[in-house]
Amino acid sequence: MLEILKKSLKKAPIVKRGKYPYFIHPITDGVPAIDPKLLDEISDYIIEYSDMDVDRILSIEAMGIPLATAISLKTGIPFSIVRKRQYQLPGEIKISQSTGYSKGELYINGIEKGNRILLVDDVISTGGTLRFLVKALEEKGVTISDIIVIVGRGDGVQQLAGEGIRVKTLVDINVSEDGVSILEDTGETN
C-alpha cells in the first residue's frame, strides 16, 4: 500500500536548511514534477481511510492545493485553502503561527461555524501549523472529522496527540544527510 509514495520518498534528494536535513519531494515541495499516479494513489488512500462525511476539505497552501484538488475532484466535495495572504473578506480567520521552520500569519476563508471539514496537509514536523489551525477552527465552531497528513517526520504527531489532537499520517519518515528512511507503521495511518 502506498508503494509509489514510499518509493519516491526513498529517492528524495536531501539538502541542508540551517541545522535541518531537508528532503525535496513532489508532494511537499512541488519539485520535481508531481506524478499524477502518485497524486492518484494518495488521494485514493485518503478517501478510503478518512471520514468523508464533510461539508468541505481544508488544506494549506501551497502544497495542500494539489492534494485538496485531487480529493475534491474524486468526491465532489468543495475545498478551501488556508492562505498566507489576507483577503479581508467577512468572516476571515487570522492565525498567527510558528513552526520549526518559520513564523507568520495564515488566513482562512470559506469556512463557517457548524461546518464539518476534512483537514489535509502535506507534511508535519513540529506540529506548529496544525496546532494553531485546529485551535482557530474549534474557536470558530468548526468540526474537524479527520486530520490527514501525507508525510510525518519529527515528533509533531506525538506532541499534538498529547494535546488531544489526533493526526493520521500516511507515511512516517526519518531524514538524515544519508537520505529518507520509511519508519514502521505506527498505527496512526488508519
Curated annotation (Swiss-Prot):
Gene3D superfamilies: 3.40.50.2020. It is found in: Cytoplasm. PROSITE patterns: PUR_PYR_PR_TRANSFER. It is an enzyme of class 2 (transferase). It catalyses: IMP + diphosphate = hypoxanthine + 5-phospho-alpha-D-ribose 1-diphosphate; GMP + diphosphate = guanine + 5-phospho-alpha-D-ribose 1-diphosphate. Pathway: Purine metabolism; IMP biosynthesis via salvage pathway; IMP from hypoxanthine: step 1/1. GO terms for molecular function: guanine phosphoribosyltransferase activity; hypoxanthine phosphoribosyltransferase activity. It comes from the Archaea. Transmembrane segments: none annotated. GO terms for cellular component: cytoplasm. Its EC number is 2.4.2.8. Disulfide bonds: none annotated. Pfam families: Pribosyltran. InterPro entries: HGPRTase-like (IPR026597), PRibTrfase_dom (IPR000836), PRTase-like (IPR029057), Pur/Pyrimidine_PRTase (IPR050118). GO terms for biological process: IMP salvage; purine ribonucleoside salvage. Keywords: Cytoplasm, Glycosyltransferase, Purine salvage, Transferase. Belongs to the purine/pyrimidine phosphoribosyltransferase family. Archaeal HPRT subfamily. HAMAP family: Hypx_phosphoribosyltr (MF_01467). Catalyzes a salvage reaction resulting in the formation of IMP that is energically less costly than de novo synthesis. PANTHER family: HYPOXANTHINE/GUANINE PHOSPHORIBOSYLTRANSFERASE, XANTHINE PHOSPHORIBOSYLTRANSFERASE. Homodimer. This is Hypoxanthine/guanine phosphoribosyltransferase. It comes from Methanohalophilus mahii (strain ATCC 35705 / DSM 5219 / SLP).
